[in-house]
Amino acid sequence: MKKHVTEEQKTSAAPEAEQASPESSAAEAATPEERISRLEEQLAAKEAECRENWDRFVRERADLENFRKRSNREKEELLNYGTKSLLEEILPVVDNLERALSHANENGSTGLTEGVQMIHGLLLNAMKKFGVTPLETSGAPFDPSFHQAMTQIPTDEHPPNTVVEEFQKGYLLKERLLRPAMVSVATAPK
């Protein structure tokens, strides 16, 4: 039985040897310069592939870093200004409380005035905790970034482009404008 296996191995090994011999004979037939040239071409191809992979790695790493920065910036924006829409809805309530206070003061309703003042103060304090601050407009120079001009008043009492009267308060949310102040602006008399 051992002889039989050995003969099978010999018969299967013979075709492999025949197949390998043309390759080895071609390799042996190539001159050393041709082999060096072929190896240099292979090396150049691998170096080019390596450079492409390195460039791709650098680009992907930069993309990842940009993604991280953008995500952090968006997260910070959300934390700082995520309450903006809620606060915009609360501002008309503050305006109405202020109107009620001015009306109650004119009519002399002290009990009602004190209650509304207390509610108004609590609401302003709650808004302040979220970073909402009123814009100071009286006597300030007109700034279209923070003020909305409703009327122009020709006057000598105030320099031109100065806020004369405030119709509705403006508010900032941290450093961003939440709502512009509605104002009248002084102009030079004609």
Curated annotation (Swiss-Prot):
The keyword Chaperone applies. One of its GO terms (cellular component) is cytosol. GO terms for molecular function: adenyl-nucleotide exchange factor activity; protein homodimerization activity; protein-folding chaperone binding; unfolded protein binding. Keywords: Chaperone, Cytoplasm, Stress response. It comes from the Bacteria. Residues 12-30 have a biased composition (Low complexity). Transmembrane segments: none annotated. It is found in: Cytoplasm. GO terms for biological process: protein folding. Gene3D superfamilies: 3.90.20.20, Head domain of nucleotide exchange factor GrpE. The keyword Nuclease does not apply. Residues 1-10, 32-42 have a biased composition (Basic and acidic residues). It holds the Pfam family GrpE. Residues 1-42 are annotated as: Disordered. Homodimer. Belongs to the GrpE family. Participates actively in the response to hyperosmotic and heat shock by preventing the aggregation of stress-denatured proteins, in association with DnaK and GrpE. It is the nucleotide exchange factor for DnaK and may function as a thermosensor. Unfolded proteins bind initially to DnaJ; upon interaction with the DnaJ-bound protein, DnaK hydrolyzes its bound ATP, resulting in the formation of a stable complex. GrpE releases ADP from DnaK; ATP binding to DnaK triggers the release of the substrate protein, thus completing the reaction cycle. This is Protein GrpE. It comes from Pelobacter propionicus (strain DSM 2379 / NBRC 103807 / OttBd1). The lineage of its organism: Bacteria, Pseudomonadati, Thermodesulfobacteriota, Desulfuromonadia, Desulfuromonadales. The gene is grpE.
